[in-house]
Amino acid sequence: MDASVIVVGAGPAGLMLAGELRLGGVDVMVLEQLSQRTGESRGLGFTARTMEVFDQRGILPAFGPVETSTQGHFGGRPVDFGVLEGAHYGVKAVPQSTTESVLEEWALGRGAELLRGHTVRALTDEGDHVVVEVEGPDGPRSLTTRYVVGCDGGRSTVRKAAGFDFPGTSANREMFLADIRGCEITPRPIGETVPLGMVMSAPLGDGVDRIIVCERGAPARRRTGPPPYQEVAAAWQRLTGQDISHGEPVWVSAFGDPARQVSAYRRGRVLLAGDSAHVHLPAGGQGMNVSVQDSVNLGWKLAAVVSGRAPAGLLDTYHEERHPVGRRLLMNTQAQGMLFLSGDEMQPLRDVLSELIRYDEVSRHLAGMVSGLDIRYEVDGGDHPLPGMRMPHQELVRADGKTSTTELLHPARGVLLDIADDADVREAATGWSDRVDIVTASLHDAPPQGPLSEARAVLVRPDGYVAWISPGSRAGLTEALDRWFGPAR
């Protein structure tokens, strides 16, 4: 085998997955078509759940001070993310190019292998391994691996070569994006519906502004390259009245509003993550964030299966958990597209939504959906509200000093948090101690009515989601350990 796992694509999804696999002790090779990183940034920031994920792996400090904004939107209607409870709420502005740089350094620092300038031409699932045909700087070569994961974007070669069904709708609108230097542009950070379409603008720093413009009635077009800047400037002037033709274009692109998702995230030994599995209108900055979270869900499971710590059936839970998340992503981005991009016939609905958002419960629902903080997986954890949800950040005190639930997840292992100092709980988990860290610690400054207020013990998966909780007895603990971490040893 050339590598236990080959990941195709060195964007945020592929690099995050590579790092997760290395944390799980699996050798991984990343194949990237581009010979060097691009400075272009489609994504401009993180949502709250992605910040938590990066913090759980110790990556977040590499992005600088955690300065977040609580101002978000849903279809151009302002939403206050401050109504959410969490370690980090709101949105942190970070260009995608910076995210890729940080994740590449993190993954390579843990031993991942990255081959740039390598294009996948074909692949064959042989049942017990996969053969990948690659064109590289030194010519064609065949690589063998136990599993392949396509993280190669909306036009995924892996998805097509492996025969994944990709139902949904193609783009029916075209939007322009341009990063421009030398123009004074009024900020419209959450977008603005104007008589002829929708416009959005925001400063990126260093004298560069980003604009997005969608002219109503402009059909989707198959382009072989970026649109001419003057075409973008003309559309901007028609919609806003502002002449930006004298600006210096740093980057120009066009995109649409497709809504497609693969029917299955896995076919045999080939899996998909990120835009390879789902494409959608980039509304609310969700695309990169959902992609990273796909990889964090898959990484520990694939590592456990490859290393023999868990049965292959664990991989089925990747589709079971992430496909509904992707489906909901398409639903909410389509709804936002209707609000953003439709004509005056949609104005009554916009006005009603603006009224509803004033209620905290509505804002909390929409903010939770866009941020990813409201995701709950089916983990058979009983009636307690926490199983299946993300583990909240909580300061802890143990015999050797202070720690936190976030810090305990840095190694990407399971964690059994013994809050009540219960020897029976610790004894029950000893057969999994090679895969699960058993930690005795008390809660520090926990809110009296918080989610952990009555917990005696909590089992947390490597991706930070609660698999089991004990308000009283240890019933169900060994079953949860067996389900998520394989048989006792």
Located regions from the model:
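Core Rossmann-like FAD-binding/catalytic domain of the broad FAD-dependent monooxygenase superfamily
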Residues: 1-350, 354-361
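Helical substrate-recognition/capping region of FAD-dependent monooxygenase/halogenase enzymes
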Residues: 1-4, 8, 24, 33, ...
